[in-house]
Amino acid sequence: MASHNENDDIPMLPISDPSSRTRARAFTSRSRSVSLSNPTSSIEGFDTSTVVLGYTGPLRTQRRPPLVQMSGPLTSTRKHEPLFLPHPSSDSVGVSSQPERYPSFAALEHKNSSEDEFVLKHANLLRSGQLGMCNDPYCTTCPSYYNRKAAQIPTSRVSALFDSTFHNALYDDAKGWARRFASSVNRYLPGIMNPHAKEVQTWTKFFALSCLLAIFIDPLFFFLIKVQEQNKCIMIDWPMTKAFVAVRSVTDVIFTMNILLQFRLAYVARESTVVGAGQLVSHPKKIALHYLKGKFFLDLFIVMPLPQILILWIIPAHLGASGANYAKNLLRAAVLFQYIPKLYRLLPFLAGQTPTGFIFESAWANFVINLLTFMLAGHVVGSCWYLFGLQRVNQCLRNACGNFGRECQDLIDCGNGNSSVLVRATWKDNASANACFQEDGFPYGIYLKAVNLTNHSNLFTRYSYSLFWGFQQISTLAGNQVPSYFLGEVFFTMGIIGLGLLLFALLIGNMQNFLQALGKRNLEMTLRRRDVEQWMSHRRLPDGIRRRVREAERFNWAATRGVNEELLFENMPDDLQRDIRRHLFKFLKKVRIFSLMDEPILDAIRERLKQRTYIGSSTVLHRGGLVEKMVFIVRGEMESIGEDGSVLPLYEGDVCGEELLTWCLERSSVNPDGTRIRMPSKGLLSSRNVRCVTNVEAFSLSVADLEDVTSLFSRFLRSHRVQGAIRYDSPYWRLRAARQIQVAWRYRRRRLHRLCTPQSSYSL
């Protein structure tokens, strides 16, 4: 009588139930390498998610019957997971067996740890919801897997994990009332935002327009001061002053909001922008330090409300209504002192260019921006001409006051009411003061037209004529102006000439070069599109294929920027090419067999990598077809669909067609006695369909290149380490081991059943 063991009642590899259903769970590890496989089995954790496992065809050795070679993955980050094929039961004849599902604590733990790692890495962006997502379908900076993962992970889990991890570090358990208040306020603040989010891009365009308004508004403060020819004095237009101060305050508020936005806006690390890829830095502390070390203090100086403080507080409180003359000098100093840094900071936005790319991409938009820049130069020159002309009128009145013989300095300010009516009437009739408003009364030079303009009551008229004068002088390089002997006037004329030359040399030349370069690229694209359209029309391709061809051409242009990297490498030294390829193709070492190879072999492989682009819904490999290349995904998402319908997603850093490497290595392998293993010339067949979910940038390695490398370095393949890695990572040997275990266990069950049957009959 055989003893009844408890473990014998529970089969180690039970027969799969035909009614069971499996679902393929997406791998969350970013370091895996998954490729094509045979009908897969799965291991199910307590969360009912399944782990998809793939298989490959046989690794042929000597004295083996011929088998059809199938494709499957070589490497996986999941270790110690049993692989097996579902075995149909006796009572399920004629019904296709379903993959078996088994509880696995390791799978559940690995899933949770992988998702937690993703959540911790991108917790700040995930908390922001839509503001943390990239809305650019042709983005070459943000990781394309982010949006999909962000949609799969619930916000509640993100918040809980983020709060438990970062709350103590950020707020020190909120021991003080200030920290508790900051902790409560932080819940209502927006999270870290993606620079490519739709809302952020809309704000950037709005901020660019507000920068244009801010640059135009500052010189307008000069037109608030005018001359009263009747009273021979200078005054401030206080009603218009309040309107200008309000507009300037609005632009300052917008700029302040943009400063606050920079502390919540993720940025792309420069060192990560390789092969079109980029890593978004979303840690709040790193973002704050990056901005503080950058242009924070310059932005803080620009946003300081100096004109508002002068007009609303300093002039009324200390100078009173008679402060027009002093206001002129203070405004000139404050506006010009703050205007130069503002131009340096805001002109890139005015040009439509930011660290994340162009704001206005069309040629006409850039043409309008360059035209507005030319208008800005005329606006600044005309405003300064009006201010300096007003200063020359003030100087003429001061000279007339010196010849007046009485204390009349206060009379130059219209708001002064301390002087008697008789003295003011005498000042009005002074011949020297009246001569200041005549053409030959004072050497005004280039400011002669500004004399009568300063006493015009209509502000729009004063500004329009000044703008016209500025345009005229920039366009003619001040060729029709002859300055007087006043040094300030001479230097101002020289500045106009230099600015005009600079605009023609840089702005006009830059606009011309930009239009020519843009036209050249557009011409190339237009010619290529025309050739493609003519070819498709000649071949009478259907509309669906034509649409895919157009999308492929567009994405290929967006991915390569019209630059052929192979042509760039041709004129570079060999060592420089090798170093560049080592830097670009670091993902090769994610494949386990490649990680065991020496650098010379990897360099030979890197030289043979070719850049490929695929559009969404493109088929990379199909079931029953030959596996002719290995594809390394750089950006985008693919999915591998098995024969049983299981779906396996592939992201950046993954590889499809990796079994091709083992197939080529086996063809170059040797037996322990040193003889070469004979392999048939038939190619490797794929058992899965691999298609693109999104647009994909990748590098491919053809089977001919792999065979070339293995033939060149065949000596290296005799290493026991490489041979062991080939057999360890081979899905065929794993499949064979799983089958042997299943056969042995079924044999043991039958023996136990035979031993238990006589005992049961005897007991009855």
UniProtKB/Swiss-Prot annotation:
Transmembrane segments: 205-225, 243-263, 296-316, 330-350, 367-387, 489-509
UniProt region (Calmodulin-binding), positions on chain: 713-729
Binding site for a nucleoside 3',5'-cyclic phosphate: 593-710
Range annotated as the organelle transit peptide: 1-25
Protein's membrane topology: Multi-pass membrane protein
Localization (cell): Plastid, Chloroplast thylakoid membrane
Region of interest (Disordered), residue spans: 1-40
Function (record text): Probable cyclic nucleotide-gated ion channel.
PANTHER family given in the database record: CYCLIC NUCLEOTIDE-GATED ION CHANNEL 15-RELATED-RELATED (PTHR45651), CYCLIC NUCLEOTIDE-GATED ION CHANNEL 20, CHLOROPLASTIC-RELATED (PTHR45651:SF11)
Name of the protein in question: Probable cyclic nucleotide-gated ion channel 20, chloroplastic
Organism for this UniProt entry: Arabidopsis thaliana (Mouse-ear cress)
